């Protein structure tokens, strides 16, 4: 449950009158509920129960320092796609050792910075990127921890422009080529194999695509555990918001009554 409620016809966030905030600070104005963020994090953490799990917030979703600081205090890790995002996480008190560096456009400077800060893992998108990261790590005598992002060829049942897990999508290594990439990674002197990652899309409003993708990848995960001792399987993708149902909920005159 979120903490945005109407009280005597005026919208409040927790106990704060949003009309007063708008008058004091002007509009447009972004207001975040710390209690909602805490509750949602707690619900996800508790839903995973006794499983050995790690929650990583995607900084690209919201890089506000106060939001990042709150999540860091809760123990969250972070998914980053740039050196700038890593800088913001560190500034907010986040632990680089709980950060995974994703994305296809990592620069030499960003890779060096991430290695110097001791990030947990790079998610690599191609064999060429694997070789590139190995070379950068070697130039500063470091060992780069990596996970290969695979494409499981699963339909995320989301908008075609934010689907990333089908064979025709541009992201990740083809499922059938995965073991070849890990074999190459194991031979590179400045690469440390950490795990495996998939990301099938954003704005998913049903868990069935996750289930299908996990079932498809699990045999590969087991083989990688036996062969290379991987530490984790990252299940990427964003749980979505059902906007239409949210707007349609309640009696038809609800909106007019709030004016």
Feature locations, PLM:
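A charged N-terminal "starter" segment
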Residues: 1-144, 183, 187-192, 223-228
């Amino acid at each position: 449950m979120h903490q945005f409620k109407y009280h005597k016809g005026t919208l409040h966030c927790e106990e704060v009158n949003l009309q007063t905030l708008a008058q004091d600070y002007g509009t447009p104005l972004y207001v975040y509920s710390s209690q909602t963020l805490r509750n949602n994090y707690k619900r996800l953490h508790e839903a995973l129960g006794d499983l050995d799990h790690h929650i990583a917030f995607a900084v690209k979703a919201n890089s506000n320092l106060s939001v990042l600081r709150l999540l860091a205090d809760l123990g969250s890790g972070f998914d980053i796609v740039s050196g700038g995002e890593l800088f913001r996480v560190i500034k907010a008190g986040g632990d680089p050792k709980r950060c995974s560096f994703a994305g296809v456009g990592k620069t030499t400077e960003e890779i060096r910075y991430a290695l110097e800060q001791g990030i947990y893992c790079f998610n690599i998108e191609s064999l060429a990127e694997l070789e590139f990261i190995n070379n950068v790590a070697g130039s500063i005598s470091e060992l780069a921890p990596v996970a290969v992002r695979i494409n499981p060829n699963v339909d995320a049942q989301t908008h075609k422009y934010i689907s990333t897990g089908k064979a025709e999508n541009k992201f990740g290594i083809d499922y059938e080529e995965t073991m070849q990439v890990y074999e190459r990674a194991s031979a590179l002197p400045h690469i440390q194999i950490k795990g495996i990652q998939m990301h099938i899309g954003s704005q998913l409003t049903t868990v069935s695509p996750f289930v299908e993708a996990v079932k498809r990848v699990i045999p590969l995960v087991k083989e990688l555990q036996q062969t290379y001792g991987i530490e984790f399987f990252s299940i990427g993708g964003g749980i979505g918001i059902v906007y239409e149902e949210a707007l349609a909920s309640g009696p038809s005159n609800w909106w007019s009554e709030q004016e």
